[in-house]
């Protein structure tokens, strides 16, 4: 959805003729007639409900097209007050605003009204859907271009100067109007008109395509459109924001499929400053939004919407905008701030080759992590690596690394193998042959399950592909900034699916109802049940198809390991070497460019794979297993002895270790204060009968009498010794319990690691 091209309006005719880089800036004061023509009205409850229903419905439909839609930084979105959502890059024509509206609605429950071109509103499906979202229509001058009399060409020495033949520039054209070329090859804004056959443009035509340059140098027909007064649009936006509502805008002006951002239009800055200038008590905040896609035009791809930090507009900047002499500087300053905010939430590259190299660097850098990184973190990693690559690309290490990465990518294309499947293929002929066989059987089963849904929905697939490709060719012929016009493909695929899927379900339901016409069933129930069944079958085919495609992609490296094992081994070796070099380079240069980059913390958080660390863990686990086995044997040995009570254990312990008690106490406490002077050498009389059957048969009456006498004399010492012994046994028991708990935890970790390895 494009942003309006805004024109500046000054009070005097003299100021109207000034030339500036921001000729699209409108004056801070809006026409009084426009103010009176539009009066803001709060949307009715019905409109709000329809907005919520339409957003929820389309957002879930888009979830069928995209495999995953994620939001990041939604907590930064203000929950109150006027907000302008500035989104870029505009890579999906009518998909972008719906995804953004859905994320905002889901996170902070706020409604966003997008600015949309009036020409788009005239398209039946787009205009119908836009009516539910309270969109604001904008008339663009280029949409009003009409053929004019005569032909034009540019001066070879000055491309801004246009020379006319049989033209009437003085009567047919006006300053700040548009001169357009045929076949949508571009347009330019008139700066001044010297005569009927000569005028000067503010900026020269874009001559990126050879046919455009040839036409302008040899002569061509042209179109003209008068300047459009956008004061009504301004006033409507100002009032919308003044009532604490949200506006959405794509400041690039139109959708495109380039890898970098287009120059931002000044309209978004004027909207924010103009609203705060007209309503001093209003505080407008601007939230940059990054629309990040992985293959935006492909079915079942992924999308990430990232919200940046809100941009606060200082009162000093509003005062600067209020002054006619400095208002352009204020707009430029705010526009630069918005541009920096967008760059912080988007991934942009200078060319496609750079993007491919950076994505390979990111993928190979991630090989050190044993856990899967979240999608928003991958986007942030892409963004930082793009910035780092652009900054250090002339470094000899980076240049050599780039050369090797491009060679590796060429090898991947040669084998038609994606990078993430290279390491999965192991050169084991018998095992891989079995895997290919069993996975092929599984794929056949999945294919048979998905086949009914595929057959039922195939007309929509075919129609959507053909129409979207035709729309892409049309859009490419009318644009000077698109590369392949992939930005319109997803939009038309979704629109065709939304329009024809219900019709197709009705068609199949009618056939089923007709087939079952002889059954004594209610026809309405049969039709309704058939319709619901068609929806369930096709959606199930979608889910099963995802699983099947993942399995089908995994067959390629297995087949390659059977047919070209040496080539696969070399590819795996090159990948490992590249990964080691990339990890070293990123860790070295990353901390220099980004102070908050901490590779150690990243490694710790995502459980980095380290061979030395794994060996250490394995050794520790083996040691604990050995201790556990020894403990089990000791327990079995103890259980076979005739000791049947804890007290007997204590007595046996005293009987066998009485000589070492004192030494152990000295060694442990390094003190003599708690060592008993008299140890309990013999058993108590009350225990003698039990001890005689469990420890030793020799216990004469003399010894028993002597034991009683000693116990009477040395009862205190005996109690102290017994207390110390109990304490030691308790400590040993607690220590053993702790070791058992640690061993159990280690066993659980081993089981989890084994399951992850199997997965």
UniProtKB/Swiss-Prot annotation:
Transmembrane feature ranges: 49-69, 435-449, 451-465, 494-514, 524-544
One MF annotation (Gene Ontology) recorded for this entry: glycerol-3-phosphate O-acyltransferase activity
Recorded metabolic or biological pathway in which this protein acts: Phospholipid metabolism; CDP-diacylglycerol biosynthesis; CDP-diacylglycerol from sn-glycerol 3-phosphate: step 1/3
Chief subcellular location: endoplasmic reticulum
CDD domains: LPLAT_AAK14816-like
Gene Ontology process terms (BP): CDP-diacylglycerol biosynthetic process; phospholipid biosynthetic process
Lumenal side: 1-48, 450, 515-523
SUPFAM superfamilies listed in its UniProt record: Glycerol-3-phosphate (1)-acyltransferase (SSF69593)
Composition-biased stretches (Low complexity): 688-702
Membrane topology: Multi-pass membrane protein
Taxonomic superkingdom: Eukaryota
Residues covered by region (Disordered): 613-667, 684-705, 729-759
Subcellular location: Endoplasmic reticulum membrane
SMART domains: PlsC
General function of this protein: Dual substrate-specific glycerol-3-phosphate/dihydroxyacetone phosphate sn-1 acyltransferase, catalyzing the first and committed reaction in the de novo synthesis of glycerophospholipids and triacylglycerols (TAGs). Prefers Gly-3-P over dihydroxyacetone phosphate and has a marked preference for 16-carbon fatty acyl chains. Transfers a fatty acid from fatty acyl-CoA to the sn-1 position of glycerol-3-phosphate to produce lysophosphatidic acid (LysoPA).
PANTHER family to which the protein is assigned, alphabetical: GLYCEROL-3-PHOSPHATE O-ACYLTRANSFERASE 1
Domain notes for this protein: The HXXXXD motif is essential for acyltransferase activity and may constitute the binding site for the phosphate moiety of the glycerol-3-phosphate.
Family from the record: Belongs to the GPAT/DAPAT family.
Note: Present with 1050 molecules/cell in log phase SD medium.
Name recorded for this polypeptide: Glycerol-3-phosphate O-acyltransferase 1
Organism of origin: Saccharomyces cerevisiae (strain ATCC 204508 / S288c) (Baker's yeast)
């Amino acid at each position: 959805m494009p942003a309006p091209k805004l024109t500046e309006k000054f009070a005097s005719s003299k100021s109207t003729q000034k030339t500036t880089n921001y000729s699209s800036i409108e004056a801070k004061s809006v026409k009084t007639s426009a103010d009176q023509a539009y009066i803001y009205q709060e949307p009715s409850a019905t409109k709000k409900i329809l907005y919520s229903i339409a957003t929820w419905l389309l957002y879930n439909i888009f979830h069928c097209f995209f495999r995953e839609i994620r939001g990041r930084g939604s907590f930064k979105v203000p929950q109150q007050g006027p907000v302008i959502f500035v989104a870029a890059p505009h890579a999906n024509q009518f998909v972008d605003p719906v995804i953004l509206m859905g994320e905002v609605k889901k996170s902070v429950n706020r409604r966003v009204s997008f600015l949309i071109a009036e020409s788009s509103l005239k398209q039946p499906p787009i205009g119908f859907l836009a009516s539910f979202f309270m969109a604001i229509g904008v008339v663009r001058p280029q949409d009003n271009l009409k053929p004019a009399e005569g032909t034009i060409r540019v001066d070879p020495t000055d491309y801004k100067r246009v020379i006319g033949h049989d033209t009437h520039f003085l009567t047919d054209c006006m300053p700040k109007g548009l001169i357009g070329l045929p076949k949508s090859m571009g347009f330019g804004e008139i700066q001044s008109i010297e005569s009927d056959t000569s005028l000067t443009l503010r900026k020269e035509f874009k001559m990126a395509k050879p046919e455009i340059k040839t036409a302008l140098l040899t002569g061509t027909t042209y179109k003209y459109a008068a300047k459009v007064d956008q004061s009504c649009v301004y006033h409507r936006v100002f009032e919308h924001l003044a009532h604490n509502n949200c506006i959405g805008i794509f400041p690039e002006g139109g959708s495109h499929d380039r890898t970098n951002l287009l120059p931002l239009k000044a309209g978004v800055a004027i909207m924010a400053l103009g609203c705060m200038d007209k309503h001093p008590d209003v505080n407008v905040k601007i939230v940059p939004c990054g629309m990040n896609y992985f293959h935006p035009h492909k079915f079942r791809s992924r999308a990430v919407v990232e919200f940046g930090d809100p941009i606060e507009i200082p009162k000093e900047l509003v005062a600067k905008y209020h002054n006619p002499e400095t208002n352009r500087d204020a707009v430029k300053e705010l526009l630069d701030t918005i541009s920096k905010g967008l760059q912080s939430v988007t991934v942009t590259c200078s060319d496609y080759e750079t993007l491919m190299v950076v994505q390979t660097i990111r993928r190979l850098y991630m090989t050190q992590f044993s856990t899967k990184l979240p999608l928003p973190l991958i986007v942030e990693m892409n963004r930082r690596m793009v910035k780092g690559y652009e900054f250090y690309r002339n470094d000899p290490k980076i240049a050599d690394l780039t050369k090797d990465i491009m060679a590796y990518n060429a090898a991947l294309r040669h084998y038609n193998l994606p990078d993430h499947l290279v390491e999965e293929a192991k050169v084991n002929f018998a095992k891989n042959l079995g895997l290919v066989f069993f996975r092929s059987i599984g794929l056949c089963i999945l294919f048979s399950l998905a086949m009914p849904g595929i057959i039922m929905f195939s007309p929509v697939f075919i129609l959507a592909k053909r129409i979207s490709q035709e729309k892409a060719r049309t859009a490419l012929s009318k644009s000077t900034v698109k590369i392949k016009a992939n930005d319109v493909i997803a939009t038309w695929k979704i629109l065709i699916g939304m329009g024809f899927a219900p019709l197709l379900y009705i068609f199949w339901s009618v056939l089923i109802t007709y087939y079952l016409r002889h059954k004594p069933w209610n026809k309405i129930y049969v039709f309704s049940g058939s319709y619901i069944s068609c929806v369930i079958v096709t959606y199930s085919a979608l889910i099963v198809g995802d699983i099947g495609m993942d399995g089908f992609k995994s067959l390629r490296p297995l087949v390659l390991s059977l047919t070209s094992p040496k080539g696969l081994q070399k590819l795996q070796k090159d990948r490992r070497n590249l990964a080691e070099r990339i990890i070293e380079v990123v860790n070295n240069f990353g901390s220099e460019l980004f102070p908050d980059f901490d590779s150690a913390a990243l490694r710790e958080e995502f459980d980095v794979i380290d061979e030395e660390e794994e060996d250490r863990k394995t050794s520790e686990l083996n040691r604990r297993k050995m201790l556990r086995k020894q403990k089990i044997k000791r327990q079995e040995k103890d259980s076979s002895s005739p000791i049947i009570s804890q007290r007997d254990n204590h007595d046996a312990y005293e009987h066998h270790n009485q000589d070492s008690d004192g030494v152990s106490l000295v060694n442990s406490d390094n003190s003599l204060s708690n060592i008993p002077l008299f140890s309990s050498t013999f058993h108590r009389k009350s225990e003698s009968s039990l001890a005689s059957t469990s420890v030793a048969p020799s216990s004469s009456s003399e010894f028993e009498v002597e034991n009683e006498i000693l116990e009477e004399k040395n009862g205190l010492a005996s109690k102290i010794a017994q207390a110390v012994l109990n304490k030691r046994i308790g400590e040993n028991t607690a220590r053993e319990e702790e070791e058992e708990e640690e061993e159990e935890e280690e066993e659980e970790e081993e089981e989890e690691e084994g399951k992850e390895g199997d997965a």
